[in-house]
């Protein structure tokens, strides 16, 4: 019935937040939570402050012996992946409670008991078949993709499939909501 081809974006978020003080942990959790509720906007870069990074790196210095320091771009990417991973998990969990859901990925998550893990789907030989044979193909874009029509949407439509996508501003420019 429903298919997702792609990563689950399982991150090292809990590992990298473990040594942090409670304020920093809460602040990062707030960023992930807020970004997860916003479509059509990307908040993460503006919410990562120099003060936050300085405090995080002080906390890391207390436990790291290799001189590890978190950079702004690395933190931004980790938070974007964590947000996307949570969204994909939630969508798959909710849909799999009511429909047959297949995940084509090298990632697995034991918590998704009702999802059928199908393994890797080759872009040229297997993906077109998945897209054309599924009733609904999911597109849940990585949060760093701010604009543009995701390639996955074009892939699915090019194979004659039906795609259900997260909001991307450009989709409204080229498609009529509720009609196409």
Protein language model annotation of sequence segments:
Residues 10-90, 94, 98-100:
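Extended, charge-rich helix/loop segments that form flexible
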Residues 1-15, 123:
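Conserved, well-structured beta-alpha core segment at the onset of a catalytic domain
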Residues 6-9, 99, 105, 142:
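Short, flexible loop/turn elements at secondary-structure junctions
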Residues 1, 82, 103-180:
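Catalytic binding pocket for nucleotide-activated donors in carbohydrate/polymer assembly enzymes
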């Amino acid at each position: 019935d429903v298919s997702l081809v792609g990563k689950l974006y399982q991150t090292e978020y809990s590992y990298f937040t473990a040594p942090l003080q409670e304020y920093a942990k809460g602040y990062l959790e707030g960023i992930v939570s807020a970004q997860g509720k916003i479509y059509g906007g990307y908040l993460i870069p503006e919410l990562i402050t120099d003060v936050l990074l300085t405090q995080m790196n002080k906390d890391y210095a207390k436990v790291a012996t290799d001189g590890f320091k978190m950079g702004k771009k690395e933190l931004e990417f980790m938070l974007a992946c964590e947000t996307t991973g949570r969204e994909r998990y939630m969508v798959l969990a909710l849909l799999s409670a009511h429909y047959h859901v297949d995940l084509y990925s090298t990632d697995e998550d034991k918590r998704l008991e009702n999802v059928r893990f199908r393994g890797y789907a080759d872009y040229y030989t297997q993906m077109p078949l998945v897209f054309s044979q599924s009733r609904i193909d999911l597109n849940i874009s990585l949060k760093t993709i701010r604009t543009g029509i995701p390639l996955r949407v074009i892939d699915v439509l090019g194979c004659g499939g039906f795609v259900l996508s997260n909001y991307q501003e450009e989709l409204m420019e080229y498609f009529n909501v509720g009609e196409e």
